[in-house]
Structures are given as C-alpha cells and as structure tokens.
C-alpha cells in the first residue's frame, strides 16, 4: 500500500514529492514519450477560483499513484489550504471507499464490476460516475535480451493461465514452446504478475486470459513497477504492467488478437486508435448525484485534471493524455 499526504503549502508539498517512493521508481524514459506525444493544444489552461478549501482523499489503484500525486502537487500551487491524501491499495478498494464515504475519488485501472456498481446504487439510488483520466496500454514485458518477436493473446493465455480459455491446445511452459531455439529452447518461462486486489490483474485476467484463471506459478508482485523490475532481473521472465512502467531493461512484446490478426506494437498511435489489444482507460470514479451541483473542491480538482496542466501530468507519468473533445465530455458527466 502507498499512502501519501500533501498539504498544499509549498514546503510540505516539496517534501512529500521528494519522499514519495513510487515517483522515485518511475522510469526515466517517460521523458522520451513526452517528445513523441503532445498534450492537445485545445485543452484549456487551468484558471483557479476563489472559495476552494477542505480535504480530498483518494483511495484506489496503485497504477495511478504517481498521476494522483502529480495532480495533487499541481493543485497545491493554486490552493494552499487544501489537504490531499492518496492511498494506493489497488482498484478493488476504490468502490468500497466511495460507498463508505471515506474517499472523494476512486482511481481505477479497470471499469467497476457490475456487482460493485449494484452495491453503490443500492445505497445511493444512482450509479457511480466514471471519468476517463488518461489512456494506458497494458504491456507484456520480457527481458531486453529475449528474442521473442511477437505473441498472440491465445499464446499469452497459454503462458499465464491454467484454464486456457483462449483455446490453446496445451499450456506453454518453456520459451521453446514459442519457437525459440538454442539456449532458449528448454528454458522455463518465469511468470510475474499482480495480486487479485489490483485492477491491472483484473484487466489482464479478463482481456488476456479470457476470464480464465492464473497459473499458481505466477510470482505476485506488490506493484506495477515491481513486476517490471522482476522481469528486468530475470532473463527468462515475462510479466504484465502499464506502459508507463517500461524501462530500458525490458521490451514490450508486440501483440496480435489471434493468429490471423495483424501484430500491433505498443505505440501511442495504436493506443489512441484502439488497435492495440490491451489499451485501456485510466478511470476516476466519483459519487455524483445526477442533476446536482458537485461541490467546489471536487469540481476544481476535476477541472485541473482535464486542463492542459493536468493532462501534462498524465503525460509526465508515462501515460497518454486525453484529446480535448474527450476531456470536455468527461467534465460534462458531472455537469461541468
């Protein structure tokens, strides 16, 4: 779990940013992504307003810890009397916190399940509002020295799943099973992943494992960065994590939906078009009664998120910013 407290006074914000371990682990090549992807020039610059104070608490996805922290730091520059607390326990914790009234925002790296929505609606009489905050690609990573050229989702399923709902005839346990030769032929595949509280785990289970079950041999890691670190230190390793966590020590393997489909690289263009099989929206859920006015504190935080500055924070964290038309639609969901 990661918990971050930011009181929006300059000295304390600076201290919080310097001491935040997740930010320190973020790969340096996010800067390279900034050079190839630009924030939409049509996004509005954030304009602060008077009368904003109080406390914000975010509970949910650890994948979005860095982004939430960057937003909090940017927000801090405008509102010195606002306190922000960020807890990254996994996407599964977001719905319960919103239902229990213990959080302002519920960041999730997957959509809420029907059961979670139903539980929320049972208490409040309306559904939670999901707001897209950025675009991510869930990459399948191998060690940088691994010669594998591409994988189909059926192969990914046969590597990670014991149920093989993707239709593979047999499980894949060595790199030779994927056609690699020489020293790789008999090398066992070493699996890295997340635990069941993670939205990344849930998304991968649904979309790459065809809702099947993970093998018991998957080494469950405490965070997205840890998965990449595990693969980076294991020449036979393979794991899944957000594209924002890519480092120079791993490769994101190009993927195809099936054996008849085009192999798609993990590039920004393929994320925006939706061609990449594991592209996903990063979501922020809020408790907002339709037709009502959202409170000033959450209103302004959401406006900051969807501003030019807020989407630059998304880009800095290694994800892809929203086009202005999409950002505008997100604010309309809460009457803004």
Predicted regions, residues:
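Bacterial N-terminal signal peptides that target proteins for export
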Residues: 1-10
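Bacterial N-terminal signal peptides
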Residues: 9-19
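Sec/Tat signal peptide C-region and signal peptidase I cleavage site
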Residues: 20-24
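Flexible loop/hinge segments at secondary-structure junctions
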Residues: 25-336
């Amino acid at each position: 779990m990661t918990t971050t407290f930011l009181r929006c006074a300059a000295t304390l914000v600076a201290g919080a940013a310097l001491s935040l371990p997740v930010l320190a682990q973020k790969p340096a090549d996010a800067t390279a992504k900034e050079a190839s992807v630009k924030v939409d020039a049509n996004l509005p610059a954030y304009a602060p307003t008077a009368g904003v104070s109080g406390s914000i608490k975010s509970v949910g996805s650890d994948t979005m810890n860095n982004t939430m922290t960057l937003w909090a730091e940017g927000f801090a520059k405008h509102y010195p009397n606002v306190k922000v607390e960020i807890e990254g326990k996994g996407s599964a914790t977001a719905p319960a916190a919103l239902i229990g009234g213990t959080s302002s925002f519920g960041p999730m790296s997957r959509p809420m399940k029907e059961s979670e929505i139903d539980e929320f609606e049972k208490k409040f009489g309306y559904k939670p509002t999901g707001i897209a905050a950025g675009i991510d690609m869930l990459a399948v990573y191998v060690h940088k020295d691994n010669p594998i050229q591409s994988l189909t989702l059926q192969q990914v399923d046969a590597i990670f799943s014991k149920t093989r709902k993707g239709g593979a005839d047999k499980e894949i346990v060595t790199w030779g099973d994927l056609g690699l030769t020489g020293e790789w032929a008999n090398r066992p595949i070493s699996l890295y992943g997340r635990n069941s509280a993670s939205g990344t785990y849930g998304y991968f289970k649904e979309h790459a494992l065809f809702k099947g079950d993970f093998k018991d041999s998957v080494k469950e890691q405490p965070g997205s960065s840890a998965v990449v670190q595990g693969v980076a230190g294991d020449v036979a390793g393979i794991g899944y994590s957000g594209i924002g966590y890519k480092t120079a020590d791993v490769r994101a393997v190009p993927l195809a939906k099936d054996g008849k489909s085009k192999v798609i690289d993990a590039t920004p263009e393929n994320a925006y078009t939706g061609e990449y099989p594991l592209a996903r929206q990063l979501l922020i859920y809020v408790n907002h009664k339709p037709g009502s006015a959202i409170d000033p504190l959450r209103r302004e935080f959401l406006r900051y998120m969807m501003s030019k500055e807020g989407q630059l924070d998304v880009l800095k964290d290694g994800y892809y910013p929203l086009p202005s038309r999409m950002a505008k639609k997100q604010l309309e969901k809460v009457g803004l």
